[in-house]
């Protein structure tokens, strides 16, 4: 893979996508071995999520990403880049006060969490932050209407 002709990771991914077989597995979860993404699925997921993000963010808006290492993390990171946002990655090991500091410091328009465990750490904080337009989650979070 030649890397000296691309300006960013998004371009690098796209150039490699054009070279690969669309139905070849590209990403695979370490926890759930049935959770895998082909090159084509990854590409289409990046496009779809970036279109959704464009409804809520403007150029250079920050998007807080709270997740463990998983295929959806990479898809989300590249989607944020495509939507012209800035990914602010956060460790999932942070506690509530760490997230509050980070949220106050970066003023994210969107927060993306991997699951209900991460959402529970921020749910009390986000109520007082009007700059947060939307909360997204990789997995379904029951008993809330705050998250899509």
Predicted regions and their residues:
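N-lobe entry segment of adenylate-forming
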Residues: 1-56, 61-62, 78, 104
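Conserved AMP-binding/adenylate-forming
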Residues: 35-36, 52-94
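Aromatic/hydrophobic pocket-lining residues that form the small-molecule binding cavity
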Residues: 46-49, 73, 99
């Amino acid at each position: 893979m030649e890397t000296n002709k691309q300006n960013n990771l998004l371009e690098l991914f796209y150039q490699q996508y054009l070279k690969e077989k669309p139905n070849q597995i590209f990403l695979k979860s370490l926890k759930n071995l049935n959770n895998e993404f082909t090159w084509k699925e990854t590409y289409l997921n990046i496009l779809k999520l970036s279109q959704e993000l464009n409804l809520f963010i403007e150029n250079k808006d920050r998007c807080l990403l709270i997740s463990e290492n998983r295929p959806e993390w990479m898809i989300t990171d590249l989607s944020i880049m495509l939507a012209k946002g800035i990914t602010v990655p956060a460790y999932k090991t942070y506690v509530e006060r760490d997230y509050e500091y980070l949220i106050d410091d970066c003023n994210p328009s969107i927060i993306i969490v991997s699951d209900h465990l991460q959402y529970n750490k921020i749910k009390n904080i986000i109520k007082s932050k009007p700059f947060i337009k939307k909360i997204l989650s990789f997995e379904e979070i029951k008993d809330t209407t705050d998250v899509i």
